[in-house]
Design a protein with these regions (language model features):
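Extracellular fibronectin type III
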Residues: 79-99, 186-202
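Serine-esterase "nucleophile elbow" of acetyl-processing enzymes
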Residues: 188-249, 259-268
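Recognizes extended acidic, P/S/T-rich segments that occur
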Residues: 22-67, 139-172
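Oxyanion-hole/transition-state-stabilizing segment in secreted/luminal serine hydrolases
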Residues: 225-226, 254-293, 314-319
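Conserved aromatic anchor
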Residues: 6-17, 120-131
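Catalytic His-Asp segment of secreted/periplasmic serine-dependent ester chemistry enzymes
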Residues: 317-393
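Active-site segments of SGNH/GDSL-like serine hydrolases
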Residues: 275-279, 300-334
Length: 393
């Protein structure tokens, strides 16, 4: 019998412009509480929270508590560590708390219940449990036979240890799988047990006629702390028709050529939306080479009876890329983007770049990191795709 934990999952309204949050838990409401300053006597403070929820050690907090009611408040921060306004109003913890008796991270990836959630390359996201500084994620091809404890399942097909609260699977997953996660301390000793297994299925379906084939811009995520399972950051989430997302974060156009047969062939698609080359061009690969890759991807699609539709490449902001990722951008990027986009515009295409081509760098309010559109840019891209696809579907 596994010991029951006394934890609580606290959830607050998400701020789509936040890079991280700071959470304070207060013992009653102090008389001199200032919404612009940290509370001196806070029972709990965590300023490194990257999604709008936290798993709280309720038993410990109750032992320290002297008043009748615990309150919490949060404030959001930007990339430079500046608060995005003051703390929220202090609210009773109980009003936003879900009791958790399992000492395990809480899975956040909601696969399959929303548009844009069908990912060939899954992302496993979770809220960490108290005391854990790293996590092991396990993927199995059957429901794990050992739901409790910390031992690996005999059905394990993939596992990885990370200090982050999201993990990008580097393998395509076609079929039905389960994933779970457990916490560990910095020595690698278990903190609690496995989370309950989460089932997900990605398989060809006659209902899904459109595939999205690209890199991280299409895979989803942005604003540094949002991943492809934060669907507000995926343009596929705002489309008026179902899609399967065959994109892989980090891909160059050459990688997209290489994995085409393995990753696109199983899905019986009518249309393939192709957006690739951004990572190649910013690293200094020539426009000619990227155009050859895009041409080859189109030919491979046609050979499978799929109609290729190219998406133009929105501009970059090299200063923001440098700040967010510490990566340089090729000096001639504007010229090479213009060359590749001219090729794309000579083919069957959707001009998603046009609304952003002002001759300036991509504005920070549309893309904090200079390459991945934030939620607002993803919405504009989706509107352009919806208008173009309306007549075809």
């Amino acid at each position: 019998e596994v010991d029951r934990a006394d934890l609580g999952l606290l959830t607050w309204p998400e701020q789509l412009d936040a890079v991280r949050y700071e959470l304070e838990v207060l013992d009653g409401i102090p008389l001199n509480l200032d919404s612009a300053r940290e509370a001196a006597g806070a029972l709990y403070r965590n300023s490194r929270i990257y999604s709008a929820q936290a798993l709280l050690p309720m038993e410990k907090l109750r032992k320290k508590q002297t008043t009748g009611v615990l309150y919490y408040r949060v404030r959001a921060f930007d990339l430079d560590g500046r608060p995005l306004g003051n703390y929220s109003q202090a609210v009773a913890v109980q009003s936003s708390l879900q009791k958790v008796e399992r000492n395990a991270p809480v899975p956040r990836s909601r696969m399959q219940d929303t548009n844009g959630s069908l990912l060939l390359y899954p992302v496993y996201a979770y809220t960490g449990n108290p005391g854990a500084t790293q996590y092991e994620v396990e993927v199995t091809d059957r429901r794990p036979e050992n739901p409790d404890g910390t031992a690996p399942s005999r059905y394990r097909v993939f596992s990885r240890v990370t200090s982050l609260t999201d993990l990008y699977d580097e393998n395509p997953r076609v079929g039905t799988y389960y994933w779970r996660v457990r916490g560990m301390d910095k020595e690698g000793k278990p903190v609690g047990q496995w989370s309950l297994p989460q089932k997900f299925t990605t398989r060809p379906s006659r209902k899904v006629k459109v595939g999205i084939y690209g890199d991280s811009i299409s895979h989803g995520g942005g604003h540094l702390s949002f991943s492809p399972v934060d669907y507000a950051y995926s343009y596929s989430h705002y489309l008026d028709f179902p899609t399967v997302n065959l994109s892989e974060s980090g891909d160059t156009s050459a990688m997209m050529v290489e994995r085409f047969g393995r990753d696109v062939r199983p899905f019986h698609l009518k249309y393939l939306l192709i957006m690739g080359g951004t990572n190649s061009l910013r690293a200094g690969v020539s426009a000619e080479e990227v155009i050859r890759d895009l041409e080859e991807i189109g030919q491979k699609a046609e050979a499978l009876g799929i109609h290729p539709i190219y998406l133009t490449l929105p501009p970059l902001n090299p200063a923001n890329i440098q700040k967010a990722f510490d990566e340089p951008t090729a000096d001639n990027w504007r010229q090479s983007f213009a060359q590749v986009n001219a090729y794309i515009r000579s083919r069957d295409h959707i001009d998603v770049a046009a609304p952003f081509e002002t001759g300036e760098d991509l504005p920070t309010e549309l893309s904090l990191d200079g390459i991945h559109g934030d939620w607002n840019m993803k919405q504009i891209m989706a509107q352009t795709i919806n208008r173009s696809m309306a007549g075809r579907l």
